[in-house]
Design a protein with these regions (language model features):
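Phosphodiester-processing cores and adjacent nucleic acid-binding clamps
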Residues: 1-180
Length: 180
């Protein structure tokens, strides 16, 4: 029996292509993740894959597994991150980004829950549920993304971190969803 912990993978990281949110270049993030011994890093800029090519080149150079993804804030729902599982997933992700960008003015996007009806095949979906998220939401998302929905907890270093984690654990347990 081994006591070694599994490798750490950052599943949600924005670069300076997420304007006013990310500060570092994608390639700098990759190099730093490798220095810290990460097993993998997901670059997940908001409704964009703009940093992926540079991140890919850097990941090849340092031998880090790069996960390709994007973050979305739905107009009528929560924040989600989608991670492409393969080339088909990458194509589905780019189609969703294109749909959202075409609907809005330059530099913006507009996506709703209805736009996810296809289930965005071949993508893992990280749901940033909140303590206010409902069982109905969990059932709906689980049905839309069968076997590919993970509830995501971000430690924000706020006084309510423990309460948020408890609520998300309950939601994950009730609906048999992984919590990451």
């Amino acid at each position: 029996m081994t006591t070694e912990l599994p490798g750490y993978a950052e599943l949600h990281c924005v670069s300076n292509f997420s304007f006013l949110r990310g500060a570092s270049h994608a390639e700098e993030l990759v190099v730093r993740a490798a220095e810290l011994g990460y097993a993998a890093l997901a670059i997940t800029d908001e409704c964009s894959l703009a940093g992926i090519v540079r991140a890919h080149v850097a990941a090849k150079e340092v031998g880090l597994k790069l996960l390709v993804g994007s973050e979305f804030r739905l107009a009528d729902g929560p924040k989600l991150v989608m991670l492409a599982q393969n080339r088909d997933g990458y194509g589905n992700l780019t189609a969703l980004i294109t749909l959202g960008r075409r609907r809005a003015g330059k530099g913006d996007y507009h996506l709703t829950r209805h736009d996810l009806a296809s289930g965005v095949p071949d993508c893992i979906v990280l749901w940033f549920a909140t303590p206010e998220s409902t069982d109905d939401e969990a059932r709906d998302f689980a049905a839309t993304f069968p076997g590919r929905l993970w509830i995501t907890y971000e430690r924000l270093l706020q006084p309510d971190d423990d309460e948020r984690l408890t609520a998300l654990r309950r939601l994950a347990t009730t609906h048999d969803l992984p919590l990451v």
